[in-house]
Design a protein with these regions (language model features):
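Short, conserved loop/helix-junction motifs that constitute active-site signature segments
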Residues: 41-42, 62-70, 91-93
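Rossmann-like AdoMet/SAM-dependent catalytic core
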Residues: 81-145
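A short, conserved alpha-helix within the catalytic core of class I
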Residues: 54-64, 84-85
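Conserved beta-strand signature within the Rossmann-like core of class I S-adenosyl-L-methionine
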Residues: 69-80
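Short, solvent-exposed loop/turn segments at secondary-structure junctions
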Residues: 8-9, 55, 79-80, 142-144
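Hydrophobic/aromatic beta-strand patches that form the interior of the parallel beta-sheet core
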Residues: 2-4, 30, 74, 99
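S-adenosyl-L-methionine
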Residues: 4-57
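Hydrophobic "anchor" residues on beta-strands that sit immediately upstream
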Residues: 1, 47, 72
Length: 145
């Protein structure tokens, strides 16, 4: 398992969590990940889980990283006026079965820790951001089984 993050504190937290869950010996944690590194995982069954706050539009490009064609990916998308969900998923249509999953509203009544709060505070506690961040679920048509 590989994890990458540009934030040193996040890398340290990842290592602590891996240790607490008994998987520290199965994870490598490094800093920034370059598109050329995808080639390292060719020939292996690979699932890429990615939430990189908009950088997915640059990093995850099959034209730059042909290895992506055989990987399955789950990517949180951060579209804006310059980057659309359709633009991102279109680049994978030849190599992947593409599914876009829209986030759903969460019920604050399901979380006991929120029940003592006023209703508006409960609602705000569950809002991560103002804009929806859908997931792209990309299943390779050529994945290694």
């Amino acid at each position: 398992m590989f994890a990458g993050d540009i934030d040193p504190a996040a890398r340290e937290k990842t290592l602590r969590n891996a240790s607490a869950n008994g998987v520290a010996d199965r994870i490598t944690v490094e800093g920034a990940f370059d598109a050329a590194q995808f080639g390292t995982y060719c020939g292996q069954k690979t699932l890429v889980i990615c939430d990189i706050e908009g950088a997915e539009f640059n990093l995850l490009d099959p034209a730059q990283s042909p290895a992506l064609a055989v990987f399955d990916l789950i990517v949180e998308l951060h579209p804006n006026e310059d980057r659309s969900v359709g633009e991102f998923t279109a680049r994978f249509e030849a190599t992947h079965d593409v599914e876009t999953v829209q986030p759903e509203a969460r019920d604050p009544g399901r979380f006991a820790a929120l029940t003592a709060l006023p209703m508006l505070d409960r609602m705000f506690a569950l809002v991560e951001r103002l804009e929806a961040t859908p997931l792209a679920v990309l299943r390779s048509k050529f994945a290694i089984s």
